[in-house]
Amino acid sequence: MSTPASTPAPDGSHQRDHHPGTRVEFRGVTKVFTNNKNTETVALDDVSLTVEPGEVIGIIGYSGAGKSTLVRMINGLDTPTSGALLLDGTDIVGMPEAKMRKLRSRIGMIFQQFNLFQSRTAAGNVEYPLELAKMDKAQRKARVREMLDFVGLSDKGRNYPEQLSGGQKQRVGIARALATNPSLLLADEATSALDPETTQEVLALLRKVNKELGITIVVITHEMEVVRSIADKVAVMEAGRVVEYGSVYEVFSNPQTTVAQRFVATALRNTPDMVEEEDLLFHEGRLFTIDLTEDSGFFAASAIAADNGVSINVVHGGVTTLQRQSFGKITVRLTGNPAAIEEFHRSLTRTTTIKEITR
């Protein structure tokens, strides 16, 4: 697979495919829908959020959290009831449709259900937005070949969607989204219809898009594993609000809200559930679940406890490395000198989060 180099624009000029990416900024955006009975539904509630050029941000939340409304705002399919939405410093709220159409040419989008034309080949699907852009035929064909090669489908150009696997269809969708040389890519539940192995392949391709082409990527998902695999930052949404925002490491290692904690737990099973706790409590000793970070003090406290007659066994949990930093939770069973166990507990209370598991 090759990396696209330069692309002829419809006017014949050449554009570099690697660019700084688009900056996206929400400023106090609220969206209220009113039905025919004048009942109001708040889909977005005072959302303020900034995505820097070249970043990959994961927007995560359960159904009804406001994720899809957020992405529809970015490509101009919905407009805020109040607030401002800026792309590269330009407020697009109230922008005339002609200007909005031009702006959309800088935005690519991929979907959960691929949205391919069944009557067109893979190459024909990738070519479609170039036809709309009135690109010269020879240039279109060259660009299609370039894009199919970039996504690893150089031998599938003549295949129709029904002849492709789910992962291949999504690759065609990505190639089509990239065909017009966008600076922003919106991925709306792009891996939800794929099996785990294919999901990782598609995420690897999106990482390649970001790293090699410099494109800003906004990933809408309800799967924390997707965020963990690809994102630099994560925004957690609930009831139309961004309730938590930070680097992937910050949110995974120390989630502050209940909804964020639930999402993190689906990706990192480091804490025993109720059934596992009951099994562990059958045995002698005291059980503690401990947050591990590079400065948690666990290993120093463990060494002191061991020197004072305490046996320490790890019975559950694990350590994860994200963004070159390690963190995790472990559950340990301590037996031996009661006073030394209590000192171990007090010591870690000062440096990290430690919780005793009791009946």
Swiss-Prot record:
It is found in: Cell membrane. One of its GO terms (molecular function) is ATP binding. Keywords: Amino-acid transport, ATP-binding, Cell membrane, Membrane, Nucleotide-binding, Translocase, Transport. CDD domains: ABC_MetN_methionine_transporter. It is a peripheral membrane protein. The complex is composed of two ATP-binding proteins (MetN), two transmembrane proteins (MetI) and a solute-binding protein (MetQ). PANTHER family: AMINO ACID IMPORT ATP-BINDING PROTEIN, METHIONINE IMPORT ATP-BINDING PROTEIN METN. This is Methionine import ATP-binding protein MetN. It comes from Corynebacterium efficiens (strain DSM 44549 / YS-314 / AJ 12310 / JCM 11189 / NBRC 100395).
